[in-house]
A protein has these predicted regions:
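Active-site helical microenvironments for divalent-metal-assisted chemistry
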Residues: 3, 7-188
Length: 188
């Protein structure tokens, strides 16, 4: 899978906004690392690359920007107002939609929270969320314990099945869900 950095030349008219978002996200996530030890920014880069791969839209630059920024409110000192000022209402709104409410998760559990949230978020936000989930399942074969992998797989499939029953999905959503399920099929 190409990273957004490798896809830059394919996104020519969108570079300025996306480059600004990448620079902001890189600075915001500085010093953060994934469980595999890689720099955290590699995750938003891959999410942006998946959005680029699967989504065709006149707002693609804004979707890619939101993909880069999707964890900034949740995992850094960034606020919704910061993003709105720098990137506009659409990008800031998408990131806000993608930001988990930790108090709500504590009340109802992560699986239920994600299911409800994904059923009601905007179509654009769902594209980014599914791209995020696709990137997260890429690491599943080598992550944690076999029991954790089986639980994560079962929860993800449950969320996706519920999503398919309770929401009208676009072709883009369906393609990303298919890619997620294909990757999960590789997991024991």
């Amino acid at each position: 899978m190409k990273t957004f950095t490798q896809l830059r030349e394919e996104v020519t008219p969108l570079n300025e906004n996306a480059e600004k978002a990448l620079a902001y996200a890189t600075a915001a996530h500085k010093g953060q690392f994934r469980s595999d030890g890689s720099e955290y920014i590699r995750h938003p880069e891959r999410v942006a690359a998946y959005v680029q791969k699967f989504k065709k839209s006149h707002n693609l630059g804004k979707l890619i920007s939101a993909a880069f920024l999707h964890d900034t409110i949740e995992d850094t000192d960034t606020t919704h107002k910061d993003l709105e000022k720098m990137f506009g209402g659409l990008v800031a709104g998408l990131v806000k939609d993608l930001t988990s409410d930790k108090d709500e998760i504590a009340k109802i559990g992560k699986k239920e929270y994600l299911s409800r949230n994904m059923e009601t978020m905007s179509s654009y936000a769902l594209v980014v969320k599914l791209a995020d989930r696709l990137d997260n399942v890429q690491d599943i074969a080598t992550a944690k314990t076999p029991e954790w992998r089986r639980t994560y797989k079962k929860e993800t499939l449950g969320i996706l099945d519920r999503l398919g029953k309770n929401r009208k999905l676009t072709g883009t959503h369906t393609k990303i869900i298919t890619a997620i399920k294909k990757k999960l099929d590789e997991v024991d």
